[in-house]
Amino acid sequence: MRYFKKIILVIIMTAFICLPVNAEMTLKELFFDESKPFHLKILDVIPEEGIIQIGDENANNTIIEFMDYFCGYCKKVHPELLQIASERKDTRIVFLQHPILSESSKLLANMVIAANMQNKGIDFHNALFEVEGNLNNAKLKQIIENLELNDAKLNIDMTKESVNNIVRLSSFLANGSGARGTPTFFVNEELVVGYISIDRIKALLK
């Protein structure tokens, strides 16, 4: 266990060295402040634009999913997560980018964060997982139109280095937390790697 914690420390310190992060969180607070659980401190590190979430940020339960938009199991679990969000008002669900499957995954991760800068991040996120069949340019364009996003601003923002850095940092934190693929979850303080059934998620809630 001590070795695992050292690995986490090395990886996340690398992220801090290489990437700009939330100035309100210091290394000392992240690793040595025991007043807050580690999974919640992850959310303090991610800049606001990178937080795609449903529910009250002060909710009693927090579910974090590291996910990829081309991950089949991420798509499978998504409606179950939305069901939990609907049924449990004491639970928030946070979706963090971990685009590992393709360059297209990285493109969509950037696009969702750019949409979040127009306050449409969660809507874009949900729409991507609700696409039937394969996602293509026509379907993507339709989502943008349906959400009434500023297409020009979206294209500019998604190429910004700050957006690239958010995605990189999120993946660093995923790897440092022990993610070996997608989806990977924190259900409160419990780390779960891989698909998890709705019943098991509910069993881990307070």
Feature map (PLM): residue ranges:
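Extracytoplasmic thiol/disulfide redox context detector
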Residues: 2-7, 16-100, 156-159, 163-176, ...
